[in-house]
Amino acid sequence: MAATEPPSLREQAEMDDADNSEKSVNEENGEVSEDQSQNKHSRHKKKKHKHRSKHKKHKHSSEEDRDKKHKHKHKHKKHKRKEVIEASDKEGLSPAKRTKLDDLALLEDLEKQRALIKAELDNELMEGKVQSGMGLILQGYESGSEEEGEIHEKARNGNRSSTRSSSTRGKLEITDNKNSAKKRSKSRSKERTRHRSDKRKSKGAGEMLREKANRSKSKERRKSKSPSKRSKSQDQARKSKSPPLRRRSQEKVGKARSPAEEKMKSEEKGKIKDRKKSPIVNERSRDRSKKSKSPVDLRDKSKDRRSRSKERKSKRSEIDKEKKPIKSPSKDASSGKENRSPSRRPGRSPKRRSLSPKLRDKSRRSRSPLLNDRRSKQSKSPSRTLSPGRRAKSRSLERKRREPERRRLSSPRTRPRDDILGRCERSKDASPINRWSPTRRRSRSPIRRRSRSPLRRSRSPRRRSRSPRRRDRSRRSRSRLRRRSRSRGGHRRRSRSKVKEDKFKGSLSEGMKVEQESSSDDNLEDFDVEEEDEEALIEQRRIQRQAIVQKYKYLAEDSNISVPSEPSSPQSSTRSRSPSPDDILERVAADVKEYERENVDTFEASVKAKHNLMTVEQNNGSSQKKILAPDMFTESDDMFAAYFDSARLRAAGIGKDFKENPNLRDNWTDAEGYYRVNIGEVLDKRYNVYGYTGQGVFSNVVRARDNARANQEVAVKIIRNNELMQKTGLKELEFLKKLNDADPDDKFHCLRLFRHFYHKQHLCLVFEPLSMNLREVLKKYGKDVGLHIKAVRSYSQQLFLALKLLKRCNILHADIKPDNILVNESKTILKLCDFGSASHVADNDITPYLVSRFYRAPEIIIGKSYDYGIDMWSVGCTLYELYTGKILFPGKTNNHMLKLAMDLKGKMPNKMIRKGVFKDQHFDQNLNFMYIEVDKVTEREKVTVMSTINPTKDLLADLIGCQRLPEDQRKKVHQLKDLLDQILMLDPAKRISINQALQHAFIQEKI
């Protein structure tokens, strides 16, 4: 009995502490419950009942609270019984135990006194100084105690995270470990209480008298307090049920924990609160009696708390390290952070975000050496009692523990840009040795790994040399993070794209870029290291790529194999996928720039070279092919044609006599709502029209010179004047603005909109001038032959970049085809245009006629839900057409389109067919394909049921055709075939993603 007695007593004392401190916290936050306000007078007459009245915190307590109270009562009874037994057994106890029990009794007395003093102070705070919660906040600002708000918040956050992390750990730990941890923490708390009791004893009696005087004063004040004020405070209390507490109660409901765990957690909480409050009380009473709230003292308090919480953290992490050496604390911490809902993240005070804990400590220290001194006396920190070795260990652990937090705060995503600039200088001071210490490198959190700084890139080779198991684990966590980040809205993606640095880009704003680079993260120290490492990394990647290419080459020889090439090598593909998406984008952008520089005047020459590779028989084949696929684009959508002649202008009705049809609404609008263009007229008092480009479904386009911008050339798109077209035009305007805002540096190859205006009730959009579209380029240069593989590679890079931007902005273009892709004069740069059919990804109405037919994805035809994959399919069809000069799927109907797609890829998966709304139009009950064709003789429709469809179209043969290709080009064509195979998967879920496409060997490897 004697053996088990002291621990239970101690537990009891700690439970009391937890309860009291929790109540005092509530009171401090201004939570005055109704019962308390009613019982105020009675409480002051009979002081003994104070605790009991405090237990009745809320009238309508929840079930858990009742349970807790029930347990509490039982504990009290046990406690009394034990005291009786203890009295009888005291003679038999050893002197050491007796002193321990004396200490505990003394501690209880002191706690009661402390609670009384606290209550008085709180009452004084409630009425003399502050009328309402708002007042409290204002007063905090007046006294210059911004730190105090910060501290409260930090305490809250700290509590939250500690409980969370402890819960995750608690689940993993073994019970005997728990007991040992308990014993350790108890012994520490005992030491601390002993220190405190000594301190308190040494306090003079004069101070006690002063406190009594205060008490009497506050009593009088309280009596005179107006009822209205009291009711106000009650209301506030009701409203401001502090969120942390509520959250805690929810956690308790949500997770049914083992009683041992719960007890441990409650003890921990109690201890934390106790530690935070008790040493400050005396100091506060002194301050308040003088009625001077000095900001200095507040700062002191904040430091105290901070130092204590840090020590606590380090202790906890030490215990963890002993228990499970496998799991690094940084991982633990970071995972906790990831799980925290993003909505809670912004709720931190901006000041706290801006300073890392270490820097804050430094700046504080330099501000007040005097305070520092006082603090060292005040906080009898347990870390001082550790041996020097252990202290050092705890310090490094502490640093590790703080690292993920600091990283999260310092990552460019969470910081405003101007903060970064200001902070960079400070980060230079923060010892570089520490920054590169091995412990730190080891504890790199996954978040950091994703960050964009060049540091990460420079370290990656080192990371690769880890053991396979760890590499695997980190890769898994990375992919999880990537998935998570994808799901978080496009907004953050957009902001990220602005912060991104493009190292290679020789743009006008390069000076600006350099500044940004130097100010982002702390990558100033080791630039030489970075360069070396980067070269090593590039070399490694090149070797990997070659291996992949070799593998693909052998697969490509067997032309009937459709696409298992990608999944067949998960290892190599994951290895090649190691660079971050941003690196890939940068590399591709650099490639495009290089292509532009090198091929300013070589476009026509390269096309001629391709013509020369063709053999004579090719011509016969092409004429046959021509009959099969009539050119539906002969005179249709030539929106941005390069040339215009008087015949075409006359045909479009330009320069005709306006008097010809007086019945029209206006003379400047024709019967179909198109604007009648007059060469030489001035639009919006600044655009001088000098040429007519052509007309599309929605609009006609003119060329003009902008008088307000030194006669800069522009293209003006004049939308048709009818309700539907106006609506479409406004939608296009909205999407263009969104895309242009998301891509300020013009890296992503979507058409730039300069401005818009109204002219004679027509909406006019002003664009950058581009000479011609790819349909015209094909017609003019590559008719039935296609373009050079170099050009196709560069165009594919640019199209994938455009898709990337569309995805970032959650937009589907839904009409990608050569007609809607414009090129500049030198045919090196292309821009995606015509967003008239575009929609938000969430508004994807199921319609079988979305996208031009030849470029329509199979999921649209069968009426399945669709997303960004439809644009990827269209790009695949376009790339084939650019290289061969022929349309890939020249279907006459939707049914024919499905037949042609299945001729290339085999029968559509049943799982996919079942999801289609229009499946019955193309498949029977047994999901066999019903091919509808027109009989050549009778010209009637006949239906052929096809249970199996084998892939008969040979993509590689079509791509190479009759060309005699040199080896380097042949290799490139094989790669293009492989890329198209992955793009043209019938099931959109298996279709290649944009990032994967950008990393494909065809895109990455130069010719």
Swiss-Prot record:
It comes from the Eukaryota. It comes from Mus musculus. The lineage of its organism: Eukaryota, Metazoa, Chordata, Craniata, Vertebrata. CDD domains: STKc_PRP4. Residues 1-102, 141-535, 560-583 are annotated as: Disordered. The keyword NADP does not apply. There is a cross-link at residue 118 (Glycyl lysine isopeptide (Lys-Gly) (interchain with G-Cter in SUMO1)). Residues 40-60, 68-82, 180-203, 215-231, 304-315, 342-367, 438-497 have a biased composition (Basic residues). This is Serine/threonine-protein kinase PRP4 homolog. Keywords: Acetylation, ATP-binding, Centromere, Chromosome, Isopeptide bond, Kinase, Kinetochore, mRNA processing, mRNA splicing, Nucleotide-binding, Nucleus, Phosphoprotein, Serine/threonine-protein kinase, Spliceosome, Transferase, Ubl conjugation. Serine/threonine kinase involved in spliceosomal assembly as well as mitosis and signaling regulation. Connects chromatin mediated regulation of transcription and pre-mRNA splicing. During spliceosomal assembly, interacts with and phosphorylates PRPF6 and PRPF31, components of the U4/U6-U5 tri-small nuclear ribonucleoprotein (snRNP), to facilitate the formation of the spliceosome B complex. Plays a role in regulating transcription and the spindle assembly checkpoint (SAC).
